[in-house]
From Swiss-Prot:
Active-site residues from the entry: 224
GO MF annotations, alphabetized: hydrolase activity, acting on carbon-nitrogen (but not peptide) bonds, in linear amides; hydrolase activity, acting on ester bonds; succinylglutamate desuccinylase activity; zinc ion binding
Keywords of the record: Arginine metabolism, Hydrolase, Metal-binding, Zinc
Task performed by this protein: Transforms N(2)-succinylglutamate into succinate and glutamate.
Database matches in SUPFAM superfamilies: Zn-dependent exopeptidases
Catalysed reactions, as listed in the record: N-succinyl-L-glutamate + H2O = L-glutamate + succinate
Record's cofactor remark: Binds 1 zinc ion per subunit.
Gene3D superfamilies: Zn peptidases (3.40.630.10)
Protein's recorded name: Succinylglutamate desuccinylase
Pathway: Amino-acid degradation; L-arginine degradation via AST pathway; L-glutamate and succinate from L-arginine: step 5/5
Length: 344
């Protein structure tokens, strides 16, 4: 495994050729500046000899068909392995769901991004590949963050692409963080990365980014970088800004961020989540409606169990509508425009 990676510098290829395990962990050095540790398939750590003050996680492929972030992360890993760039921050890359990537599908059995914060082990337990992998990914995040001295800034960007078109092509979900201010620097880092829209969540979830935020105090986000396309069919020029900013972050180059202003970003507050309670749940709008489509107060969004579900606020925008989820799961997130909450 070690020689294959040293020869190819292609960690994604090694991961997809061994989607369940690489066997034993292995490590090697790059010059005299970086220790590389491979903990598992899809799990690689770059440890600078003299690390600066941030611990950075970039995760991708939690959903197997969201390929642009996978290609983006693999490009960064290749550049690090080729020593075209040199890590100055401790950096962990996670390729989330190799089995689903090989399958060309969003999932194998279950949505992995609903299985963190221990949800993987709740009934019915560790019964499928996503649940097993989510548990492992949690252990790698724990190991990575706890291996460094206290007081360092912890960052986790969980990278995705959306299943549908969007009024705002790139957007981020800021996990619920009661008692903690939102980071103006992080919001402007996202804006510099081309992610000019932020959704402030209103409650705990079982997503990967919420896990890192809540358990480790990380500046963590679920980041949507565009629309789903098959592997190799992404226009990677659309991710130049994101690649540049991620490179600056992990190589400790000046970030050159603008000062925070609500004029420079689009901010939304999650006002409610609509879950599915009956098999007959259906939306009233077209299946191809774009993310952030706005509806007026009183508009009937959906019907189920003989009841109508209506827009409650003066205007609500929607993201991630999906009527085909299992009963009990989220069908859509409803948003209202936000004046910046506690942003510092």
């Amino acid at each position: 495994m070690l020689q294959a990676l040293l020869d190819s510098k292609d960690f994604l290829a090694l991961t997809l050729a061994n989607p369940q395990t690489l066997g034993d962990e292995f490590s090697f050095t790059l010059g005299e500046h970086t220790r590389v540790n491979v903990w598992d398939t899809g799990v690689i750590v770059f440890e600078p000899a003299q690390p600066q003050g941030k611990d950075v996680i970039l995760s991708c492929g939690v959903h197997g068909n969201e390929t642009a972030p996978i290609e983006l992360c693999n490009t960064l890993i290749k550049q690090l392995l080729q020593q075209k760039i040199i890590a100055k921050q401790r950096t962990l890359f996670l390729i989330g769901n190799p089995l689903a990537i090989n399958n060309g599908t969003r999932i194998i059995d279950e949505n992995m991004n609903r299985l963190f914060s221990g949800e993987h082990s709740n009934p019915p337990g560790l019964v499928n590949p996503e649940r097993l992998r989510a548990k492992k990914l949690e252990t790698y995040v724990d190991r990575f963050f706890k291996a460094a001295a206290a007081g360092r800034q912890r960052i986790h960007y969980d990278l995705h692409t959306a299943m549908r078109a969007s009024k705002h092509e790139k957007f981020a979900i800021y996990p619920y963080r009661p008692g903690r201010a939102y980071s103006a620097e992080q919001i402007m880092f996202l804006a510099a990365s081309g992610v000019d829209t932020v959704l402030f969540h209103h409650e705990p979830t079982t997503t990967f980014s919420y896990f890192s935020s809540e358990q480790y105090g990380a500046d963590a986000f679920t980041i949507e970088l565009g629309k789903v396309y098959p592997m190799g069919q992404n226009d990677m020029t659309r991710f130049i800004a994101a690649q540049e900013m991620f490179t600056r972050l992990i190589t400790d180059k000046p970030l050159q961020l603008e000062s925070f202003s609500t004029d420079k970003v689009n901010l939304y507050q999650v006002c409610r989540v609509i879950n599915k309670h009956f098999d007959d749940f259906e939306f009233t709008f077209a299946t191809d409606v774009e993310n952030f489509r706005a509806f007026p107060k009183g508009f009937v969004l959906a019907r189920e169990g003989g009841q109508e579900i209506k827009v409650e606020q003066e205007v609500e925008s929607i993201v991630f509508p999906n009527a085909k989820v299992p009963i009990g799961n989220r069908t859509v997130i409803c948003l209202i425009p936000s004046v910046a909450p506690d942003v510092r």
